[in-house]
Amino acid sequence: MARRNFKVLYVSGEVSPFVRISALADFMASFPQALEEEGFEARIMMPKYGTINDRKFRLHDVLRLSDIEVNLRDKTELLHVKVTALPSSKIQTYFLYNEKYFKRNGLFTDVHNGGDLKGNTEKVIFFNVGVLETLQRLGWKPDIIHCHDWYAGLLPLLLKTVYASNSFFSDVKTVLTVHNVYRQGILPFKVFQKLLPEEVSSALYRAGDNVNMLYTGAEHADLLTTTSRLYADEIVGNGSDTYGLGTVVEERKSTFHGILNGIDTRQWNPSTDKLIKKRYAADRLEGKLDNKKALLDEAGLPFTEGRPLAGIIIGFDAFQGAELLKESLVKLVELDMQLIICGSGDKEYEKYFQDFAAEYPEQVSVRTDYADTLLHLAIAGFDMLLMPGRIESCGMLQLFAMSYGTIPVAYAGGGIVETIDAVTDKSGSGFLFYDYTADAFAGKVQEALDLYHDEERWLQLVLEAMGKDFSWKNSAGEYDQLYRKLLEE
């Protein structure tokens, strides 16, 4: 058991159920709790987006955390903080708010080409500096600041430059976890140069006229992790396919660790889940059909006895598989199944999928406004979960799915291979396709459908999937050891 006076601050741009952009939000919903159970005192900081409902999540103002000054070189912006507990826990979650940056601009927008869509650059600088200013006003000094993805990539550098002489942050260590190597926060250098001291802007990792936020974080964090061993192996030394990130990770591979994701089995357990239509378990599976009927009704699709229901939950961008899905849809609807697509993101993809669904009103439904309640019902109601994303560091959705007896069909990349046992004649927990093409994807779905109609074999597959242990127990123990080793250095 770790010493209880060890404190860890988790910093992320998304945390479920407050806001979900990607699987990172699901990770953040359970990972801090798992580490707190190892004996660490955990807290979370994230932006207070205008889309977050204060009343629903019981956010309240903290008077002593009002009007915090955030100095952006030639100007000062004020920061206000709200707080609530992470649901089903006592973990304090702090929401950093400034009307200019977060009321209308909303979520951080992933930028790959150096653009500054929705003012990302100034927003992310404000957020990173604001985290450190909030800690000082709060008077809570963490032993470790654990940064997640590019949103928090500036923190390690700030601590080693402008905050290095600040006694409040003496001996504070930083960890950066890479959840998605393709989301790196490529933003224009000129904005950093305008808003940050020269000692910071000169140390940023630059690619031409742009700054790479994730690369900058990877250069300066004390420890690097990602969410599976295989994904770590894919990144190391792979400079060309990782926009250069593999190069810095190769240089720092002694401090780079792949640790598999887990899930909170108290929140994600079909026998106790309060967010689904009817609870069920491996020894009483009839409840799963009730969830399927409820989901179809919610999606506006008819129920037909024996007809399989497949689901897709992705962000509408090429990195999460929207392009492959677009290329595959005609092939998929030719198969005898129904399809529910849950996602949001690129408006062109969104329109395409909605227009496509309109052509098949009894077979395809698209939801762009799904909330946590629908996510649970979807995982319980799907017969299979289709995962067209090319790269998954580990992913969380397939872990949720298998725990609920929903069979994944996924591309064999990254941590997916570590979590899904490919179906063979005798065993398995899911289906993997190895060629990233529409034909291979649709072909594997057809293979899954063939097995679905073999009731005895499908039941065996469902029971094997539900019998797997995806709890945080082992992975939390690995992080416990890494944290303690880092703090001893």
UniProtKB/Swiss-Prot annotation:
Superkingdom in the source lineage: Bacteria
InterPro entries, alphabetically? Glyco_trans_1, GS/SS, Starch_synth_cat_dom
**Sites where the protein binds ADP-alpha-D-glucose:** 20
Q: What is its EC number?
A: 2.4.1.21
Catalytic activity reads: [(1->4)-alpha-D-glucosyl](n) + ADP-alpha-D-glucose = [(1->4)-alpha-D-glucosyl](n+1) + ADP + H(+)
Kindly list the biological process annotations in GO that this record carries. Answer: glycogen biosynthetic process
Pathways involved: Glycan biosynthesis; glycogen biosynthesis
Q: Name one GO molecular function term.
A: alpha-1,4-glucan glucosyltransferase (ADP-glucose donor) activity
Q: Which UniProt keywords apply?
A: Glycogen biosynthesis, Glycosyltransferase, Transferase
Q: Which Gene3D superfamilies match?
A: Glycogen Phosphorylase B
One Pfam family, short name: Glycos_transf_1
Q: List the disulfide bonds.
A: none
Family affiliation: Belongs to the glycosyltransferase 1 family. Bacterial/plant glycogen synthase subfamily.
Q: Which NCBIfam families match?
A: glgA (TIGR02095), PRK14098.1 (NF010698)
Q: What does this protein do?
A: Synthesizes alpha-1,4-glucan chains using ADP-glucose.
Please give the name of this protein: Glycogen synthase
